[in-house]
Amino acid sequence: MVRREQSNAERGLVLRTERCSIHDGHGIRTVVFLKGCPLNCWWCSTPESQSFEIEHAEGNTYGTYMTVEEVMKEIRKDSAFYFHSGGGMTLSGGEILAQPDFARSILRVCRNECISTAIETSLCSSWENAASILPYVNTAFVDFKLVDNALHRKYCGIGNRLIHQNLIK
């Protein structure tokens, strides 16, 4: 029997999860780092998140495919901390909008379970992708890398016009 692949809304490429974070939004949070980013910033704090593929280097594996339920199982582990600290879950990356259906599914389940949601994004995606997740987001951190388009292209690998247009919207 051939196993059918799950849809993008139910399965995505996750770099890692970090529990009990206090740096990615208010209160104590679980941060889910998605893998894959259209940018290639020279100063990226998580360069292992840039590739859209699972990578193996120096005995480490970077990335694993997870279902929404598997991700939620990790998020729920710290739910008592969220409610007592005003925290919740933060989606980060990579670029979360590179996996918009998966990101939206995670955010939707969190909102349905009254878990506060935050995202970290460069907005380097279509506006439709961004707009589709915003109803499920409590806090958005937008990392606008460089104002100058030529410098953005030099240091991030692509220009910033799309990002700038999304910020205006």
Question: Residues of each region from the PLM?
Answer:
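N-terminal [4Fe-4S]-dependent radical SAM core
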Residues: 1-66, 77-83
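Soluble or luminal CAZymes and related metallo-dependent hydrolases
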Residues: 63, 67-70, 162
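Conserved AdoMet/S-adenosylmethionine-binding subsite of the radical SAM
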Residues: 72, 76-169
